């Protein structure tokens, strides 16, 4: 929503390079799978969105540095609004059924390396999450409920310690999530 490809300079970095690049403020954001996501969060990256929020059953996450969020709140809100629009459109296509739903099933199937039936099951189990879901107290993906994403961040911290990706669990896991105000700002983007 209001974001063009030219607004973002995308580069490919291997996870072992991205974590130090984050720590040196050489990159503003990164898309990665866990356990690297846990390492980035432990380095001070803010969790912006998990791939599961868009219907992908993985632990991949979108992150942005605190500095980027502070310096570019409008860009961050537009990015999140764009992800929200994609989720909303996917949900609408699934609800409409027919050819519209088949496009979503095909995309999810291709992204996950599964057939159409498996893609349908994945989407049934985890429909694309919208900002309304993320701001709801009732959603397991809630940014505002202690049983939502915060519980997942705590769990990922434990997993990362067990995998020896980080030395200790985050002291303040809530600080690893994007602030509620960012999600609310994204809802206002037209």
Can you say where each PLM-predicted feature lies in the sequence?
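A local structural motif
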Residues: 1-13, 24-27, 46, 166-170
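A short, structure-level motif marking secondary-structure boundaries and short turns
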Residues: 2-4, 20-23, 140-143
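Residue-level "edge-of-site" marker
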Residues: 11, 35, 53, 122, ...
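A short alpha-helix capping/helix-coil boundary motif
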Residues: 14-17, 44, 133-137
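Pocket-lining segment of extracytoplasmic ligand-binding domains
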Residues: 17-113
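Short, solvent-exposed polar/charged micro-motifs at secondary-structure junctions
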Residues: 22, 129-132, 179-186
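Secondary-structure end/capping motifs
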Residues: 70-165
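Conserved C-terminal helix/tail region of periplasmic/extracytoplasmic solute-binding proteins
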Residues: 150-190
């Amino acid at each position: 929503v209001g974001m063009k490809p030219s607004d973002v300079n995308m580069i490919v970095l291997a996870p072992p390079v991205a974590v130090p690049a984050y720590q040196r403020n050489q990159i503003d954001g990164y898309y990665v799978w866990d356990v690297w996501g846990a390492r980035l969060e432990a380095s001070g990256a803010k969790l912006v969105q998990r791939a599961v929020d868009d219907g992908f059953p993985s632990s991949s996450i979108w992150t942005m540095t605190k500095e980027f969020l502070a310096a570019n709140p409008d860009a961050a809100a537009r990015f999140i609004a764009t992800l929200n629009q994609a989720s909303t459109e996917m949900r609408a296509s699934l609800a409409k059924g027919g050819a519209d739903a088949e496009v979503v099933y095909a995309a999810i199937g291709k992204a996950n390396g599964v057939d159409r039936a498996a893609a349908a099951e994945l989407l049934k189990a985890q429909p694309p999450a919208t900002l309304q879901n993320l701001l709801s107290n009732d959603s397991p993906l809630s940014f505002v409920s202690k049983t939502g994403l915060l519980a997942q961040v705590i769990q990922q911290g434990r997993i990362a310690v067990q995998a020896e990706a980080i030395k200790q669990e985050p002291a303040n896991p809530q600080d690893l999530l994007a602030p509620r105000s960012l999600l609310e700002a994204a809802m206002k983007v037209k």
